[in-house]
């Protein structure tokens, strides 16, 4: 297996798809990386030679990927929570952040329903 950015990418996949196994690289960024490094996107990972892998490593090191990216995202959320803005409070309360309604729906974000006893009439 080829190892790029600390991740073993699958040998049987096309390089274009295999790069998307790295956190922070989607299909569009993978295509840009391959274009910049001059590697054929249709070739399988097992058919890459060491020179191609070195080129891919050099280009991917220009991006923030994997653990660094996860840490950066976590720090951004923590900053929002620390300054006490609306977005930070919504994150802290596990509610939708971008203005969606919560009276109904928002089940994914709020979790399973909590049963409340009915009122006697």
Curated annotation (Swiss-Prot):
PROSITE patterns: RIBOSOMAL_S13_1, RIBOSOMAL_S13_2. Residues 97-121 are annotated as: Disordered. InterPro entries: Rbsml_uS13_C, Ribosomal_uS13, Ribosomal_uS13-like_H2TH, Ribosomal_uS13_bac-type, Ribosomal_uS13_CS. It holds the Pfam family Ribosomal_S13. The keyword Ribosomal protein applies. GO terms for biological process: translation. Residues 100-121 have a biased composition (Basic residues). GO terms for molecular function: rRNA binding; structural constituent of ribosome; tRNA binding. The keyword Nucleus does not apply. Keywords: Ribonucleoprotein, Ribosomal protein, RNA-binding, rRNA-binding, tRNA-binding. GO terms for cellular component: cytosol; small ribosomal subunit. Belongs to the universal ribosomal protein uS13 family. Located at the top of the head of the 30S subunit, it contacts several helices of the 16S rRNA. In the 70S ribosome it contacts the 23S rRNA (bridge B1a) and protein L5 of the 50S subunit (bridge B1b), connecting the 2 subunits; these bridges are implicated in subunit movement. Contacts the tRNAs in the A and P-sites. Part of the 30S ribosomal subunit. Forms a loose heterodimer with protein S19. Forms two bridges to the 50S subunit in the 70S ribosome. This is Small ribosomal subunit protein uS13. It comes from Prochlorococcus marinus (strain NATL1A).
């Amino acid at each position: 297996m080829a190892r790029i950015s600390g991740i073993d990418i699958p040998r049987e996949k096309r390089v274009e798809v295999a790069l998307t196994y790295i956190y922070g690289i989607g299909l569009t960024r993978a295509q840009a990386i391959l274009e910049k490094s001059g590697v054929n996107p249709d070739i399988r990972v097992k058919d890459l030679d060491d020179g191609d892998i070195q080129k891919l490593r050099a280009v991917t090191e220009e991006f923030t990927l994997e653990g660094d990216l996860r840490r950066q995202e976590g720090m951004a959320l923590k900053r929002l929570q620390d300054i006490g803005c609306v977005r930070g409070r919504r994150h802290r309360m596990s509610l939708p952040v971008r203005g969606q309604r919560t009276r109904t729906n928002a089940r994914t974000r709020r979790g399973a329903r909590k049963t409340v006893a009915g009122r006697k009439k």
